[in-house]
Each structure stands twice: as C-alpha cells, then as structure tokens.
Regions:
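Metal-cofactor-binding active-site regions of metalloenzymes
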Residues: 120-126, 130-131, 146-173, 196-203
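Histidine/acidic residue-rich metal-binding segments in metalloenzymes
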Residues: 176-291, 299-316
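His/Asp/Glu-enriched, well-ordered alpha-helical/loop segment
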Residues: 303-386
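Histidine-rich, glycine-flanked metal-binding segment
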Residues: 22, 26-42, 47-92
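C-terminal cap of metal-dependent C-N hydrolases
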Residues: 46, 378-429
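N-terminal secretory signal peptides and thylakoid transit peptides that target proteins
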Residues: 1-17
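Active-site beta-loop-alpha junctions enriched in small/polar residues
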Residues: 101-103, 130-131, 156-160, 197-202, ...
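Metal-associated gating/positioning segment near the N- to mid-region
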Residues: 77-78, 85-146
Length: 430
C-alpha cells in the first residue's frame, strides 16, 4: 500500500489522538475542550440533521484544529474566533458524492472538485473511473494532492480511463488490462475504492459481458476489498442487462440504476422494461448490490424510478455524475437538486441526507468519521436552505415532475475551514 495522502494522514492522526487523549496523552488535538478554550469556527443556530447519530434539532457546532469538538444546544459566540450564523438553515455533515468526474486537465469530462463546492455542498467526492492504470498516478499527484475537497476514486478497467471521450474506451477489449488495474488498486488502496466499467453498447460494442468479467477479476486480484462500480444505460440487449445484474456481488455498485437511455438500436434495456421491473434487478438488490443514482446528463428517468422504487429497488446512494456536459444540461444534476428530486418521488429529507452522507461514507470506508458530525470527526459541514413550495424538476429525458421542497446550497466547511466567509487567518488549509 502506498503512503497515505497528507489529508487522510491528518484525519487518521486526529482519530489516533482522540484515543490517546483518553489515556492521558499530552498535546492531543482532539483532547476534550475546556470551558475556557476557544473554537476556530462556531456554526451557530442551525437545524442540524445527522443521520449517523439519529439527530435532528437546533444545535451549535464548535470546530477546532479542523475537528468537530462540540455539538451542543447553545455555545456562546464569545468562545469562537469566527462565527457562521446558520439560523433558519439546514445543517448536515458535508455531502459525499459517490459518482463524480473530477479529473480536470486529464479526463476529457472532468471538473475541478473545488469548483463544485458552491453548487453541491460536497466535502468528499469519488472520481468514477476518470483515470485508469496509465494515468491514475497523475490524478493522485497533481489533482487530488492539490484539492481541498477530499477525493477518492474508482480505477477504470480501461488503462487510459476516460481520456479518449467521446471515443469509446472499450471498443477494443485489449484496453481492459486486468493486471495493471489490479496493481493500481493495490498500490493506492488508501484512495482507490475499486474498479469502474461502463457497460453501455456505445462503449463496449460487441464485447458483451467480458469487460465486467475483467473488471471483477481486477478487483479480486488486487487483494483489497475492492468494489465494482458498473455503469448501465443503453446496454446492448435485455439478456446482457440481466447477465450484468446476475454477476454483481454484494457490495458492488450499480450506477445509473434509474437510467432510461436507449441502446444504439433505440431499444430500452434497463432495469425497467415495458413498465415492469426486471427480476434480476430485484434479485441483485436483495442480495446486497448497491443501487446508486448517478443522475448525470442522460442517466436518470422519472418513469424508471417510479416503477423501481415501489418495486423494491430504492436507491442506497444518491450521486450526481457531475461533469462538464451534465453540468450544463437541463436536468441540473447538482447533488442537492438530485436529492430534491427524490423527495418529489416520496423519500423523506432524512432519507435523502442519509443517501448522500452516511451511506456513501460507509462505502468509501477510508478516512475516519466522514459523513458524520460526531465529536472527533473532520469538520466537514454542509449548510443549505430548505425552500418549501411548488417546484418543477426535469429528468434527462425531459419528463417533468412537481415537488414541494428544494435544497439550495448556502455554505460548505471542509476540515473546519469555510469555502468563503468567514475566512480563516492565516489561510492555512489541509
């Protein structure tokens, strides 16, 4: 395993310091804060919703040294160097987006993760196969190391990742290099969650199930608990769609689960066909395959979700699939907006926040205590307006649905430092 990134090293060190503090360690950054100690940042008066603690109510959050040090009903403003007024706002753990494209300058569709924060409230993003074995090191060294947003990744089974887009990366199956992919996952196990493969007909041509088989083999050969992330939508045949679902293991991720995209012949071969849920989809869900939204610019269809959700295939995670093309699309797949669409489909606020914090954080399972506001967790916080009233949403096939609630980003704090005011002085961030 390669060395931890500086960001994750510091997060890991904080958790160790917390444990050491209970044994009387001297100088622990996470030692219990005293009544005369000051916080670097106080987020005051917000409506805190933290599914990891089954917490909902007005709370103040005190952050010091980049770590949540207090979560109380009332913390005097005088105890903080800076105060962020969250009165009347929804305050949650920083959002965790399991499907993004955040490899600018390397992938053909990547956006700088830090540019997304104002629109997404994302403190943690997962690169969904932007890089493969040949360019993952560049993503790690030159992008992730310079980014305030916490980044993880799925390594693409194609050795060049999404660099050739819009040219398909797996028309030539020889680009799916199992050993090289396995090595990349193993050597970056602190950052690489697993392997990504896109199984649409316009990506794999006539290669059938073989790309997925190679990707699963790369996971297994890595010697790590690597997961698959499998992109569907426009699969060549209905039979192949069922084969894909049957091959997925518990804990593997089916992304674009509610896609309504047609294949190259115009046929609809997704998890809902002719208005009915595929039996293989329900079987996959029941054995523990993770259903991820991955809205994107062409991969979310209300009519699919409206059959799948009551049929037993609710999402486990809500993600954006944000990239340079989807970000300009009418569906506006910024994460809070996608969460709002699922409230329009009948999910509760608590459910959609769980699907964008606690659950994806557990899937990542790397840095301690992300996706939570527990004491000792990194100071990652999302602050949003909850706008109540009629709102209209559009999917990626121009279907419209009306909702009654919209989440709008207000402010985001990463490792205890806001993106914007109030600025930390000196501006030293991890």
């Amino acid at each position: 395993m390669s060395a931890l990134s500086r960001r994750d090293f510091l997060a890991h060190a904080s958790s160790l310091a917390l444990a050491a503090g209970t044994a009387g360690a001297i100088g622990s950054a996470s030692a219990a804060i005293g009544p005369d100690d000051t916080f670097d940042l106080l987020i005051k008066g917000g409506d805190v919703l933290d599914p990891s603690q089954s917490l909902r109510g007005k709370r103040d959050i005190g952050i010091r040294y980049g770590v949540v040090q207090a979560l109380e009903a009332d913390i005097p403003a005088a105890r903080a160097q800076r105060v962020l007024d969250a009165s009347g706002k929804l305050v949650t753990p920083g959002l965790v987006d399991l499907h993004t494209h955040v490899y600018p300058y390397g992938s053909a569709i990547g956006i700088p993760a830090d540019e997304l924060v104002a629109h997404q409230c994302t403190t943690t993003c997962v690169s969904a196969g932007d890089a493969g074995a040949n360019n993952f090191a560049a993503f790690r060294r030159h992008i992730a190391a310079q980014t305030r947003t916490r980044l993880y990744a799925f390594v693409h089974i194609a050795n060049m990742g999404l660099t050739p887009f819009p040219v398909a990366e797996l028309y030539n199956i020889d680009y799916a290099q199992v050993d090289a992919c396995a090595r990349t996952v193993a050597e970056n196990a602190d950052m690489a969650i697993g392997v990504k493969v896109r199984m649409s007909e316009n990506v794999i041509a006539k290669n059938g199930i073989e790309p997925l088989k190679r990707a699963i083999l790369a996971c297994e050969k890595s010697g790590t608990p690597a997961r698959m992330m499998v992109h569907i939508g426009g699969v060549e045949t209905s039979d192949l769609m069922s084969q894909i679902l049957d091959l997925l293991r518990p804990g593997d991720i089916l992304t674009h689960a509610y896609s309504g995209a047609p294949n190259m012949s115009g046929a609809f071969t997704n998890i809902v066909q002719n208005g009915k849920l595929l039996p293989a989809a329900l079987a996959a869900k029941q054995r523990g395959v993770i259903f991820d939204v991955g809205h994107g610019g062409g991969s979310f269809d209300f009519t699919v979700a409206e059959v799948a959700l009551p049929g037993g295939c609710t999402p486990d995670t809500i993600s954006s699939d944000i990239h340079v093309f989807s970000g300009n699309s009418p569906g506006m797949p910024y994460l809070p907006n996608v969460m709002s669409k699922f409230m329009a489909l009948g999910l509760s606020l608590e459910q959609v926040v769980t699907m964008a914090t606690t659950t994806p954080a557990k899937i990542i399972n790397r840095a301690p205590k992300i996706g939570t506001l527990q004491i000792g967790a990194p100071g990652d916080v999302a602050i949003m307006d909850v706008v109540e009233g009629p709102v209209s949403f559009v999917d990626t096939r121009n279907n419209r649905r009306d909702g009654k609630m919209l989440l709008k980003p207000v402010q985001t704090v990463v490792n205890g430092v806001p993106f914007g005011r109030p600025y930390q002085a000196p501006f030293a961030v991890r």
